[in-house]
Amino acid sequence: MVKLRLKRCGRKQRAIYRIVAIDVRSRREGRDLRKVGFYDPINNQTYLNVPLILYFLEKGAQPTGTVYDILKKAEVFKELQINQKKSN
């Protein structure tokens, strides 16, 4: 199973997180399948590769709690619903 989760980067006391698609059995710092964005909690910046995120969500990837909140704030799930309506 694939999850969308945060992978810690940066230095001490200055964490930046990459949002990655990764196998559930891998460690947090393990090898990821694909980088799909990043999140900087200090500067409150977020970059998301929305088409790639939508691809993984359509294939059944599950976001973790924090990633779910980030995607919800960016209104990614609305785009997912629009894409599903178009395909029906």
Swiss-Prot record:
It comes from Calycanthus floridus var. glaucus. It comes from the Eukaryota. The keyword NAD does not apply. Its main location: plastid. GO terms for cellular component: chloroplast; mitochondrion; small ribosomal subunit. This is Small ribosomal subunit protein bS16c. InterPro entries: Ribosomal_bS16 (IPR000307), Ribosomal_bS16_CS (IPR020592), Ribosomal_bS16_dom_sf (IPR023803). PANTHER family: 30S RIBOSOMAL PROTEIN S16 (PTHR12919), SMALL RIBOSOMAL SUBUNIT PROTEIN BS16M (PTHR12919:SF20). It is found in: Plastid, Chloroplast. GO terms for biological process: mitochondrial translation. GO terms for molecular function: structural constituent of ribosome.
